[in-house]
């Protein structure tokens, strides 16, 4: 069973789970760390070692190593570390995207250590890239450039935080970014996962800049020596995966509750569980301005 962005109501509590009751409405992150291993205690929840050590991407369990959320019921592992109560003021729709895409996108901005006044370029304005754009704005970037060719996503990028959106089909992206930033961005966030955008991110940076990589790459990834100043340009490349755990979810809900971030425009379509094939057909074809779909049992 797939699905890793769950909001639900507690139907049953396992032994040792305290501070919750039947009927509580909760958000659970896409990453479900144990909270006790070396990775978790170091703040690297996505690399959870399930009690000890470190395991690459070990925190991603829903729909990967255990059954996921697109069902009537969901068993949450290490529930004490992963159940985040939803404030009464927030709807399911306001919080469901925090479980994965918002946490991931924001992490791209956080991992880059964006500073107040930085210039930032975000390649690809899909759901995660849009959240990276919003995260860059929250962290104090003074000028944010989105790179996207889809008209619906270009408009959403401007709505959510981009000052300028470059269409790569209409302009030379690297040249335009360098022109707009007086020589190169402080931070480039890669949210697509292909060689071309990774390389363009590097070429858009000023010397000493940071490339924050959110994309999941399926083939060989190369670092061109000229874009990397032969390794001596003080460039930084950082990678990240969606942080999880109840404290991460609490913090994200606090941002929504304070009205500093509204994820609901990204949730463009809703379906019942028995319409799931229709939902995936729409999502896969990117018709009708779809960004994210919600499935209710």
Where does each model-flagged region fall?
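C-terminal hydrophobic helical "lid"/dimerization subdomain
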Residues: 171, 179, 183, 187, ...
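Glycine-rich beta-strand-centered segment in the early N-terminal region that forms part
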Residues: 1-41, 46, 66-67, 87-89
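Glycine-rich phosphate-binding loop and adjacent beta-alpha segment
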Residues: 141, 158-159, 163, 194-261, ...
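Mid-domain Rossmann-like dinucleotide-binding core that forms the NAD(H)/NADP(H) cofactor-binding site
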Residues: 26, 83-171, 175-176, 187
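Short glycine-/small-residue-rich Rossmann-like dinucleotide-binding loops
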Residues: 14, 31, 170, 192-193, ...
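A general structural signal for well-ordered alpha-helical segments in protein cores
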Residues: 7, 71, 83, 102-105, ...
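NAD(P)H dinucleotide-binding glycine-rich loop of Rossmann-like/cofactor-binding domains
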Residues: 34-123
């Amino acid at each position: 069973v797939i699905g890793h962005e769950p909001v639900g109501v507690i139907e049953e509590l396992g032994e040792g789970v305290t501070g919750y009751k039947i009927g509580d409405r909760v958000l659970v992150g896409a990453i479900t760390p144990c909270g006790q291993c070396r990775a978790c205690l170091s703040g690297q929840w996505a690399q959870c070692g399930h009690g000890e050590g470190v395991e690459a991407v070990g925190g991603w369990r829903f729909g990967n190593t255990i059954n996921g959320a697109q069902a009537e019921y969901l068993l949450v592992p290490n529930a004490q570390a992963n159940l985040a109560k939803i404030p009464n003021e927030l709807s399911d729709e306001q919080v469901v995207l925090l479980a994965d895409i918002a946490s991931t996108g924001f992490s791209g901005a956080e991992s880059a250590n964006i500073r107040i006044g930085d210039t930032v370029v975000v390649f690809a304005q899909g759901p995660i890239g849009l959240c990276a754009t919003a995260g860059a704005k929250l962290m104090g970037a003074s000028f944010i450039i989105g790179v996207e060719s889809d008209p619906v996503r270009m408009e959403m990028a401007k709505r959510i935080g981009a000052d300028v959106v470059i269409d790569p089909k209409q302009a030379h992206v690297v040249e335009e970014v360098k022109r707009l930033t007086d020589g190169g961005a402080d931070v480039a966030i890669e949210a697509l996962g292909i060689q071309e955008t990774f390389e363009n991110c590097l070429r858009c940076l000023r010397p000493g800049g940071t490339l924050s990589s959110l994309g999941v790459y399926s083939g060989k990834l190369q670092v061109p020596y000229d874009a990397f100043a032969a390794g001596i340009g003080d460039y930084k490349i950082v990678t990240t995966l969606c942080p999880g755990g109840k404290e991460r979810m609490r913090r994200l809900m606090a941002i929504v509750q304070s009205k500093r971030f509204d994820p609901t425009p990204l949730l463009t379509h809703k379906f019942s569980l028995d319409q799931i094939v229709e939902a995936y057909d729409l999502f896969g074809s990117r018709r009708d301005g779809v960004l994210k779909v919600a499935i209710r049992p």
